[in-house]
Amino acid sequence: EGEIHYGDSIAEGEGDKRYNVILTNPPFGTKGAGDVPNRDDFTIATSNKQLNFIQHVLTILKTGGRAAMVLPDNVLFEEHAGRDVRGLLMHDCQLHTILRLPVGTFTPYSAGVKANVLFFRKGLPTQEVWVYDSRTNVQKVNKGHPLDANYFQDFLKCFGARHTPRSQDRQESERFRKFTREQIRERDDNLDLFWLKDESLDDANELPEPEDLVGEAVTQLEVALDALNELAAQLGNGKKG
């Protein structure tokens, strides 16, 4: 039977426990953020909860272990600590797949939040990242169109049957693209990778819903707040020195 523990994974850590498989959807937003965790295993100091959860998973995942993390868009493009954590992830792990989730995935709780699933295996550095776009020009998830398995049938075919897919077993398609590590490095390790043109932007009748616009604004504000928190932490450390 599974065990459920109520606590603070970032503050408490896992001691010596290590895991073969980790599936996690860390809490989004900046609520509860502000303090930089005092953990020796975190090589990058940040108050961003999502970035710290990535570092936490890197610690507790066994070498050869597999993980899938649901993370908001800003984790893919945030600068400073965000860039450093993404670099660490791709150095320590084979980040082989990113799934861009449909708009409205978290309906009715946080309809405007845009998110992704990052799939990786610990032990080998990233050579290439395959991205599946299940968002652009895809029916938005809402009460009339709830999220179900049909949204991901094509992704599952593209992903393949292996736990850790091999590039030679995959083929690019309209929604599935490969990006080399060098291409990503040239983007300053920005993983916000997309190539399809959003047809809704050409149609005045298909403008984003208010909750989507609010979600976009919240994401940008969270990025700005994270940057300010990092600056405040740096200034605080400077005073102590």
Predicted ranges, named:
Residues 1:
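Short, conserved SAM-binding/catalytic segment
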